């Protein structure tokens, strides 16, 4: 399977790339290193012995994003590309909404145009806001988000589920995790803001 990992050099994305490569999938990465570092790609190779096919740009560049979809017969997308800092999102809400929502719209548009019907979206537990009940389960209702980052993630989820309702052949998986921590067992990959 050929999998596009948007934000594949980031903390979560790089771990996903390792798992995909170790499972013998072809991995294509788009990343602009705004939340990551170029050396992560070397660490992925050190761990797996395999290269990813890499494109350096922000998915906001729709023409370049379309070139990636044109050049590769992509089977699935794992969308981890987003601005991610809660505090910064409060200071820069316009930048967060512009980046996070527009990249998701572009990815969804390209998926539809190039008949890519599988997406896993890296969302966040922030979509629950201040939850009424803990621990949270998948059945908990979404709350009033408490910051622009969480609101953007909730909107990104809505975009993808609306597209899925319009295109029933599309499979959308939403991952709502809390702050991931730790490092890969190799010690090469870990959170490094």
Specify the residue positions occupied by each region the protein language model found:
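N-terminal Rossmann-like NAD(P)+-binding domain of SDR-like oxidoreductases, especially those catalyzing
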Residues: 1-185
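Short, intrinsically disordered, charge-balanced linker/junction segments flanking boundaries
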Residues: 190-193
């Amino acid at each position: 399977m050929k999998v596009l990992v948007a934000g594949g050099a980031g903390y979560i994305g790089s771990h996903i790339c390792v798992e995909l490569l170790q499972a013998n999938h072809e991995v294509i990465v788009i990343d602009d290193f705004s939340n990551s570092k170029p050396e992560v790609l070397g660490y992925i190779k050190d761990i797996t012995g395999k290269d990813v096919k890499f494109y350096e740009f922000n998915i906001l560049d729709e023409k370049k994003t379309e070139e990636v979809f044109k050049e590769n017969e992509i089977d699935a997308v794992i969308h981890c590309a987003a601005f991610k800092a809660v505090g910064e999102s409060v200071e820069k809400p316009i930048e967060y909404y512009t980046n996070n929502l527009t990249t998701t719209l572009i990815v969804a548009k390209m998926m539809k145009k190039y008949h890519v019907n599988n997406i896993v979206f890296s969302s966040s537990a922030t979509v629950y806001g201040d939850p009424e009940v803990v621990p949270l389960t998948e059945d908990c209702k979404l709350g009033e988000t408490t910051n622009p980052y969480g609101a953007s993630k909730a909107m990104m989820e809505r975009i993808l589920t609306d597209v899925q309702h319009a295109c029933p052949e599309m499979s959308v998986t939403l991952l709502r995790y809390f702050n991931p921590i730790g490092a890969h067992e190799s010690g090469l990959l870990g959170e490094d803001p």
